[in-house]
A protein has these predicted regions:
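Polybasic, glycine- and aromatic-enriched phosphate-binding surface used to engage nucleic acids
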Residues: 2-183
Length: 183
């Protein structure tokens, strides 16, 4: 089953950013900029959920000094929750940022995932695949530079071999190739 899902996906299409600077001391229940968290994304990844006593905001001046500020007005990146076996992906709305419970997926090329591709991340089929890809881990399920490899985009037509992509880091970070298909 794992290999069958692999054949349906193109891997290694996103880079990932996770905020580690926004802490609860910077947040309030009102303010200039909305801070999205994992529970704000619906289970199907199609909408932002407003939750009383959960939603948070940050002062614009405090936000300007943080790395996540770069993504404030971007809607060409995508959001996915950390620490879950229920992945889902949605386009990031403009005028908001995220805390560390959400990862920002940044397309490596001029990729714009279709609705169908984003919906696939919320399917039971993908979620079972993701559990195997993450080796049924229970402690560290953060979306990081290695695990983002498995956020593959659904293909029109399946591949002959399950995983043919290489993991190559372009920023001169020494990162070995994880997979290489042997012919």
């Amino acid at each position: 089953r794992f290999d069958e899902v692999c054949k349906k996906l193109d891997f290694n299409v996103f880079k990932v950013f996770r905020d580690r600077q926004i802490t609860n001391t910077l947040l309030s229940d009102s303010g200039d900029v909305r801070v999205l968290k994992s529970r704000n994304i619906s289970d199907d990844g199609k909408k932002i959920i407003n939750l009383s006593d959960y939603d948070s905001y940050i002062n614009y001046e405090a936000l300007k000094g943080l790395a996540v500020f770069e993504y404030l007005d971007r809607d060409d990146v995508y959001l996915t929750p950390n620490m879950t076996y229920k992945p889902r992906v949605m386009r990031k709305p403009k005028n908001c940022v995220v805390n560390g419970s959400l990862a920002i997926l940044i397309p490596k090329k001029d990729i714009v995932p279709t609705d169908k591709q984003m919906e696939f991340f919320s399917t039971q089929e993908y979620r079972e695949f993701y559990q195997i890809a993450r080796n049924y881990q229970t402690r560290s399920l953060n979306v990081d530079a290695c695990s983002v490899f498995f956020y593959g985009l659904l293909r029109e037509k399946g591949k002959k071999s399950p995983i043919t992509e290489k993991f190559i880091e372009e920023d001169n970070n020494v990162q070995p190739t994880i997979f290489e298909y042997m012919k």
